[in-house]
Structure formats: structure tokens, C-alpha cells
């Protein structure tokens, strides 16, 4: 109802993977496409949004933008940084001018001035959270929608499982109203959702829709490099890990030789760097350079982070986004029908 979409599926704003073509395809197929804008300049974000709109079948169809907005300074992690490079006001202006219907803030609460300005232009604001306590902080600045991501999810994520997190967040926001719509604040579920069963589960837990990332990394329209897609297809149930070595915040990625070595053999160094406000990979690279160590191209490739959730273990094919969404809806309907039949046995 909020976005006039037919399917309760939102594309996670995964930066390069969730590019203009994929975001438009999700919107064209009845969902809501969201592009990631980590590190984007205002000029580049505008170009990405212009490209996205060029792919839309309905030029008035909804889409969104996701930015990383961690708190910097004060009691925040010393490794936090301003991913916008001081250009958030300009980025907000670009988002407003583009006609976006949704703004998403991840890894932090958006500043109230930004929420107020977006509301003044009819744009809904959503906050990503990984723990129930974060919901109240987001609502305090006027956020309209809460997206709760369980630890199974790829990228920056918390420690609470989706099946536990969603009901707790649903309960915590019950009775809370969106400042923009005056209606109940919806909860979007994320983390480990890759097919219709996950969608059905999320709805049964009280969520209003799902935020899907890893499954769409393996979409034909995704901007993810082929190596990233192949890594998703190869991954097993135990092949991802949460680590702080790339951004200073816990982030779920595929295990590679570099991250495994860091976590198993350099835990003290990771902490020492973090205490000084240095991200481990940056500090380690500097140390190696000073020691005259040179990385081979292969070592550099292996050290690159490939973000993905635990759902990667259940994905075995790169398919069109439309097929992924069709199967997700069909699977959810089948699961919910089965649930109705099971209800008689309770």
C-alpha cells in the first residue's frame, strides 16, 4: 500500500550488485528496487538513478536508495567513517530530485534534518537494524519503516537470528505510527531469505515484506562481478563468516584465506588496530608495504571481500530477477496453504 507495489519484495541496496538494471527489474516485476550508494559522489548517484529510471516500464514506478550512515565520533566505533565524504546534503537533494519513494539508512540512524527534509518531499525513510533496541532510536528521529536483518544476512549484520529478531521488533513497534503516513510502522524482514518459504516465514512472524540480498546477487541483471556470483553458487552452509577486518564493523562475507588467517592468527592485531581507529586490512597493508612485502595478483584477488549471507548455501543457479520473484511468490503461497492445512492439526 505504501508504495503501490504488487509483491512484498524489496531488493537490498547492495551497492554494485544492486545496480540500476537489477533495481529496475525488481520494480518492473512488482517489487521495490533499491540501489546501494556506498561511496557514491552526488554526480555518480544521479547518473545511476537516471539509468535506473531509463529501464522502468512505468516511469512513475517506485524505487529507493540505500546509504551507509554510521555515527562518527563520540561513543561510536573509532573505525567508523563518513562514507558520504561530507556530501550527504547533496546526496539527499539528488534523491529528492530523482523522484525516489524510499530512502534507506544502514549501519546507523539518519540525522533528523535529513528525515525531515525527505518527509517534506513525500519520501519515506527506512532504517536497517540488527537488534531490537535499535528500533526505538530509529523511531525517535521519525523513521517510517524498520528493516530488521538477522545475523544470517550478508554484509553488515548483527548477532540475532532472523526468527528471533523479527517477532521482537514487531512487538517493539506495535502501535507506533509513521510521521509521514500516520499509519502503523511496518517491519521488513531480512537475513537468510532466499525463496518462498522464507517469505512465508517472515509474513507469519509479523513482517510486512522482505528485504532480499544474496539471492539477487545471483540474478542475471545484478551488477556483481562473475567471480562474486560464482562464489555464491559454490558456497556451503559453513562458508561465510562475520568479520570486522574490512570495514571495522561486523560484516558477513565468504571465507577466504586472508580473512581466515586474520581471524585465527591475528585477533590481537585486529583489536589493536581498531583501538587506534584503523581498519585491520588497511593497517595490515601498510605494515606489509613498510616491510617490503609484495602481494601477488592472486593474493590481492583472494583478499577482496565478497559479501553474501548464509542463504548462499541454498543458491545453485544464476537466474533472471523475474523468475526469482515468480518462484518466491509461488513458493510462499504454497507454504501458506500448507500452513492452513496444518492449523487444523494444532
What residues fall within each predicted segment?
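Active-site entrance/lid segments in N-terminal catalytic domains of soluble metabolic enzymes
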Residues: 1-180
Amino acid at each position: 500500500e505504501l508504495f503501490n507495489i504488487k509483491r512484498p519484495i524489496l531488493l537490498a541496496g547492495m551497492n554494485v550488485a544492486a545496480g540500476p538494471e537489477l533495481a529496475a527489474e525488481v520494480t518492473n516485476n512488482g517489487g521495490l528496487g533499491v540501489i546501494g550508494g556506498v561511496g557514491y559522489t552526488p554526480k555518480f548517484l544521479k547518473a545511476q538513478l537516471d539509468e535506473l529510471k531509463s529501464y522502468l516500464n512505468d516511469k512513475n514506478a517506485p524505487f529507493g536508495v540505500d546509504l551507509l550512515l554510521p555515527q562518527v565520533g563520540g561513543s561510536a566505533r573509532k573505525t567508523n567513517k563518513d562514507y558520504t565524504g561530507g556530501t550527504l546534503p547533496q546526496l539527499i537533494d539528488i534523491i529528492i530530485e530523482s523522484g525516489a519513494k524510499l530512502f534507506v539508512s544502514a549501519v546507523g540512524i539518519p540525522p533528523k534534518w535529513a528525515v525531515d527534509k525527505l518527509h517534506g518531499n513525500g519520501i519515506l525513510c527506512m532504517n536497517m537494524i540488527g537488534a531490537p533496541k535499535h528500533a526505538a532510536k530509529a523511531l525517535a528521529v521519525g523513521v517510517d519503516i524498520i528493516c530488521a536483518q538477522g545475523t544470517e544476512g550478508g554484509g553488515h549484520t548483527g548477532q540475532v537470528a532472523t526468527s528471533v529478531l523479527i517477532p521482537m521488533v514487531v512487538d517493539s513497534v506495535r502501535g507506533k505510527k509513521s510521521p509521514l503516513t500516520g499509519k502503523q510502522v511496518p517491519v521488513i524482514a531480512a537475513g537468510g531469505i532466499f525463496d518462498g518459504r522464507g517469505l512465508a516465514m517472515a509474513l507469519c512472524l509479523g513482517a510486512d515484506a522482505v528485504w532480499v540480498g544474496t539471492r539477487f546477487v545471483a540474478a542475471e541483471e545484478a551488477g556483481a562481478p562473475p567471480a562474486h556470483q560464482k562464489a555464491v553458487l559454490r558456497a556451503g552452509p559453513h562458508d561465510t563468516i562475520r568479520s570486522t577486518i574490512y570495514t571495522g564493523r561486523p560484516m558477513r562475507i565468504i571465507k577466504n584465506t586472508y580473512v581466515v588467517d586474520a581471524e585465527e592468527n591475528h585477533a590481537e592485531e585486529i583489536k589493536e588496530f581498531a583501538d587506534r581507529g584503523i581498519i585491520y586490512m588497511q593497517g595490515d597493508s601498510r605494515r606489509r608495504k613498510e616491510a617490503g612485502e609484495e602481494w601477488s595478483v592472486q593474493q590481492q584477488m583472494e583478499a577482496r571481500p565478497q559479501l553474501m549471507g548464509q542463504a548462499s548455501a541454498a543458491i545453485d543457479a544464476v537466474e533472471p530477477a523475474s523468475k526469482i520473484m515468480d518462484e518466491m511468490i509461488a513458493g510462499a503461497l504454497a507454504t501458506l496453504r500448507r500452513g492452513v492445512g496444518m492449523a487444523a492439526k494444532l
